[in-house]
């Protein structure tokens, strides 16, 4: 039987027809891929060319082995059948396009039957995978796909099924070997395969391939091209570790005094790293990130999958301007939406479940850095949400804790524990802000110290010399403040000779143990208190734990999923009787991370969602007592004192300042504004009673604050400028 390419159609050779089809489809495909590549390479520099061994291992596991895809067993099996099948059958496309020259002349005769069998296995695998996927989409539609257009996905599946079925017909016309090509042999025996049928099957096969090549770069199936580099250039840093503003040639963070940056964070497409931009084309639209996002589940504006789609849609819409080096009028933050940017809890559940290693969170934290350090202005839709956070930032600047409580009270929780304070010790217990000032958390800190002393450990605390680790400031986008806090704490550690730190707070555990390494904390060992307790139990220095009643455990994001510690907390309490529906690496975020603890919450849905996960496991009713967060005082005052606010806003012009000075001016301006406004507010007795007592809004404190800020302002402005207030 003649090969279809050797047949003439209306006097035109099949070779010429295939040449035209191939040139058009391959040319279009190549153009679109190179366009996407050019748009990706417009991104900021990002060194992802280190650790080649780790990258090859990750590629073999995640891309070739489909490890993350298989974490969803239903969709995973279907995708693996299609993926591995497509890899095996792709070589046959070249053979068919060459008129079987590849298999006849380039492959050794002994290998040819095995290769034919592998190709048939590939077609069979892909066909089964597509059939199952199509049935799932049409007959058993998952909840996350309902209400969404599935035309594109269904068309792609039908095209692949067409490629596979026509391949079996072509194979049947070539006289298949029943030992290796069982399906082709069955088709040949069951049906009458003529030259005409083979010709029709061949051209249907080729048209389906050409159509597929047209659709790939225009659809979500561009991930067939971009997923491989996306996985290979994954972030080898620990999960959730944020990068410093600037690093030197040794990879160490540049000190605040030596920073040389034109802008902070990212508001423009080209300010995102090139690796971050690949994500837009590598996304498979599987919606796994959407399924695990606590912000999305609680009804907020953030959809992590949409953030990734926004990167690609923004690039395509503004491609001409971007390639000319011009900035579009719309920035990337506007495309994301400020409400989405501020809704992220940085739990990294989206990053953890993504089958192609997409990095969602850095895009949002870079946007926060720009909003917090560069603009210092917020959209009206998020103003009432973010304003309490601004008060927290100011408290961190003045008192090194988010509550605004004086630093000299930081060690009061351990006053009667007979523990070393700011003295050398084998273990330093880093209490953190919550355990230092919150009554409920103080008990955790006191019990931890008691356990360590019972085990005979040499333990101390830093007392008033301890400062906030800076997690909230960094996740809020105030990298400048975080770096100040980090450098101050590291100086204290060096002065006292700290080598081992124990922390009860998962956020402090991550920040001190992972992120401080960029600032000089490489030689400090940091452990969670549950890890230490478990270690002491194994050594026999502590008795085996016992508990009565049914108990469960909620894995904190920054200890479990991000820190990788899942067993120590369970072992320390003697095991759990029942696991929640979402536990371990899949634990559902409590909603307080990413500085959300210090933002105004307009809905309790996220809290009730978390509680419902525990209640569904037949536990006794879960109760929680949430402290009332102070209302946005500045927002309220803007309504009560509009003339005063406007007068202060018009006092300072910042255009003449350099970048670094300008940021300091912005902070000082807001601090002075806050002081005067709240001083005016304190004149009203009814308003004083509304303020939470733990914020210490006493007149004497305000007088001291006025004097402190005046001294700081004078010290900064005397260098270059005279600021008149």
What role is predicted for each listed range?
Residues 21-28, 127, 161-162, 196-232:
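Alpha-helical membrane-embedded segments
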Residues 48-49, 71-76, 108-118, 142-162, ...:
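Membrane-interface segments at loop-to-transmembrane junctions
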Residues 80-90, 155-175:
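Hydrophobic alpha-helical membrane-insertion segments
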